[in-house]
Amino acid sequence: LCYTKLDFIYYGRKCGYTMNFEERKKLLAEWKQSHLLRFYEQLNDEEKQILLSQIDGIDWSFEQAFSHESKSKDSLIEEIDALQLEKILADQEHYRSVGLQAIRDGKLCLLLLAGGQGTRLGFDKPKGCFNVGLTKELYIFQLLIEHIMDVVRAADAYIPLYIMTSNINYQDTITFFEAHDYFGYDASYVHFFIQEMNPATDFGGKILLKSKYEVALSPNGNGGWFSSMHKAGLLDAIFDSNLEWINVFAVDNVLQRIADPVFLGATIASGKMSGAKVVKKAFPEEKVGVMCKENGKPHIIEYYEMTDEMLTKRTADGNLAYGFGAILNYLFPISRLKETLDESMPLHVVKKKVPYVDESGNPVTPSEPNAFKFETLALDLIHKMDDCLIFEVDREKEFAPIKNSTGVDSVETARELLIKNGYTL
């Protein structure tokens, strides 16, 4: 067996071993990150402990994103078949029956990805706390819970709901739910946890300091939620239960159907390992990740990775061959997810603006991207599945994302769709 430096670090953490100061200095020197202790002697005892604790918690796997150059691999990209609306509508009562029974039998739990802030909406709170109402209060979190409650009433059974926050909005999110009595949901079924963080680095790979005693950390992307649940100590209870499926969804689509018994029932009936809700692309160049197959396995290809030929290719019936956009609403089998805990996830490097302190300890707020962030993506989790039911939904009824304050995918467009679907705002 060949063990790496990372293996020994993670084994030590698993055994509860805490490094002393000299061991930390040696570790940082080996990773060429000794500058993290630059201001150590200027700190008080509490600040020293915060810094050392953050250093102990660094996931050093981000270094592999630098050491492994991106290399072209032989990939066969093919279109993927979907269960389309016409077929779903014809069999929906059967699918609904199968799905509701699975929910009654305690086979389904839910995961809400709610780490985002409402910054792009001009709102300095968790995005889920944003009020989309015009004449009354109607919050994003409220709408999502109401969608789940529709299923709870139909199944006569509550569904465990896990809510992943960031370290920034964790307490604000809990306080908001408590202040609104969980919008009628049984609080004993709701579990909050914090998304894991990765350090941000400058373009030379040096980890940035947010302050003299804080590492610059950022959320690890939308693909790392299962390891974050593991770190939060939530998985033992899940593994010991009857739960078989987890429905993962994002906070910003206010029309989506969550715990959808038709989606669940169709996925179970198909015999496929996983499921993904999709919408038909509005036009070939729409900026949305598209479901396809890569080397025979389910995959999401980003719009900017598609060739002109792929963008415009059509099937015999005239539809786009690569025409189903993923909307971040998935069904994953817990048994397969358990196996992924022992498997690595690719890290994607993105350029972002990250505030930091310079060598003199002065705070700097950059006006241009100055740093790398390292993220795992849900599309890589999809690719770990043997197969996937591509489940089409009506975008006018289930796709109203809120990403901007105005324009495309905005509060304005979401309000229009809510009104169109009978909501009083």
Regions found by a protein language model. Give the residues of each.
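Short acidic, glycine/serine/threonine-rich loops at helix termini
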Residues: 122-125, 172-178, 202-207, 258-262, ...
